[in-house]
Amino acid sequence: MIWHVQNENFILDSTRIFMKAFHLLLFDGSLIFPECILIFGLILLLMIDSSSDQKDIPWLYFIPSTSLVMSITALLFRWREEPMISFSGNFQTNNFNEIFQFLILLCSTLCIPLSVEYIECTEMAITEFLLFVLTATLGGMFLCGANDFITIFVAPECFSLCSYLLSGYTKKDVRSNEATMKYLLMGGASSSILVHGFSWLYGSSGGEIELQEIVNGLINTQMYNSPGISIALIFITVGIGFKLSPAPSHQWTPDVYEGVRFVREIPTSLSISEMFGFFKTPWTCRREISPTPVVAFLSVTSKVAASASATRIFDIPFYFSSNGWHLLLEILAILSMILGNLIAITQTSMKRMLAYSSIGQIGYVIIGIIVGDSNDGYASMITYMLFYISMNLGTFACIVLFGLRTGTDNIRDYAGLYTKDPFLALSLALCLLSLGGLPPLAGFFGKLYLFWCGWQAGLYFLVLIGLLTSVVSIYYYLKIIKLLMTGRNQEITPHVRNYRRSPLRSNNSIELSMIVCVIASTIPGISMNPIIAIAQDSLF
């Protein structure tokens, strides 16, 4: 009898929960329509994979690509709609959040073509790779619109778990496993620190979890200037810092960038046609081919999602502690710009060089976060983030292509690449120059707008540090470009000497992404006004 009553209560509770969830989806589901498209793509991928006897179907790439493009289209149609809070205050929809969601979708859309040839070469499982990418994208999108502590914690964990799985995808490789373990341990520690900071805010505000309600709670409890808020600020800054990877929270970045790799069998002394699979040979040597598209994906999406979350957390709950978080972020920006660019000079691996370069780049982005809504700080940050996506992914596309064709990512092995593949060498040079901020490329105008906004806000010291470190970054980028263009015959390594020249017209999906990113890294800088206007229009 007791079991009967308990069973009936369980059924009633389950039905009530289901009806409430259905009610939320029915009335609030349209506000997360772009996310629903990705969820549908995930379900479709799983259904096809479970129902098909043939594994690793090549056209599976079409499903996530179509889902991402449709999600971008849905976001564009929703532009300039009134801000809405849905799902009982857990999720907020406005132009500011949507532009970050657009950037994340753009990153994922460009990263999928990078992975096609890579997965074919490594013979890795297609479905799982695409599932992880789509799920991470979904987590990043929910993080951009998160309006309470629970969503702010769960959404990045969704992204982070997929990132851990992607970084450890080549489980037979020792260095990949080592990098994944470091990434996992530091990620878990940072999440714990972040939650601890949330708990201080939760207690100080009288038990509120929504961002705006926390501000009201702090006013009611008169705790907005208490020591507990300072403790919460420190812990939350450390937790978010891991996602953004500024110095000194950057230790995982170079190791993960270099550790994510794969090993491919390449013949030692055969013709180019034999090396690329036209003939079989029984004797081969093992060479590293890197970096992977996983690194390209992690290098941009995590920073975009974390930047969106950081702006909302610092701007709303810590409204009364603006001087405190400004000081903390200024320290992080200075350390990132100086350490990132100085250490990048000494690197011999392209992956580690780009890792330290990204640490320096996030220092520039932090300037926009500090400036904030006033003086177009957020608009300059969004503009520079858009250019950074194209510059960084374009550079990674070039390096992925070079790695697939040569089996190396050592900087000295790029010597004389222009003599073998002018198209690839010029593309890499343009992306590196844009990252350095040389005119008239997009990176120059992005940095100019960012530094100008910082100068207008009175951040003179930060802007001067940014200018000096930009000159340092130009030095090590030009050093690589000089190697590409002027490598002497005796300096050309066997990797480039045996390089297979790529045709100007190619169906290679990596080259397609590379061309798109190179164009986006050069042309938009000439016509900045429309981009700036869109960024300014998105401010909340």
UniProtKB/Swiss-Prot annotation:
Highest taxon of the lineage: Eukaryota
Ranges annotated as spanning the membrane: 24-44, 57-77, 99-119, 124-144, 149-169, 183-203, 227-247, 325-345, 353-373, 384-404, 425-445, 448-468, 514-534
Stored InterPro entries: NADH-Q_OxRdtase_suN/2, ND/Mrp_TM, Ndh2_N
Catalytic reaction(s) noted: a plastoquinone + NADH + (n+1) H(+)(in) = a plastoquinol + NAD(+) + n H(+)(out); a plastoquinone + NADPH + (n+1) H(+)(in) = a plastoquinol + NADP(+) + n H(+)(out)
Known EC number: 7.1.1.-
One example of a Gene Ontology biological process annotation: ATP synthesis coupled electron transport
Cell compartments where the protein resides: Plastid, Chloroplast thylakoid membrane
Any Pfam family matching the protein: Ndh2_N
Major location (coarse): plastid
Molecular functions (GO terms): NADH dehydrogenase (ubiquinone) activity; quinone binding
Keywords: Chloroplast, Membrane, NAD, NADP, Plastid, Plastoquinone, Quinone, Thylakoid, Translocase, Transmembrane, Transmembrane helix, Transport
EC supergroup of this enzyme: translocase
Cellular component, GO annotation: chloroplast thylakoid membrane
Membrane topology value: Multi-pass membrane protein
Annotated family: Belongs to the complex I subunit 2 family.
Oligomer and partners: NDH is composed of at least 16 different subunits, 5 of which are encoded in the nucleus.
Function: NDH shuttles electrons from NAD(P)H:plastoquinone, via FMN and iron-sulfur (Fe-S) centers, to quinones in the photosynthetic chain and possibly in a chloroplast respiratory chain. The immediate electron acceptor for the enzyme in this species is believed to be plastoquinone. Couples the redox reaction to proton translocation, and thus conserves the redox energy in a proton gradient.
The protein's name in its UniProt record: NAD(P)H-quinone oxidoreductase subunit 2 B, chloroplastic
Biological source species: Coffea arabica (Arabian coffee)
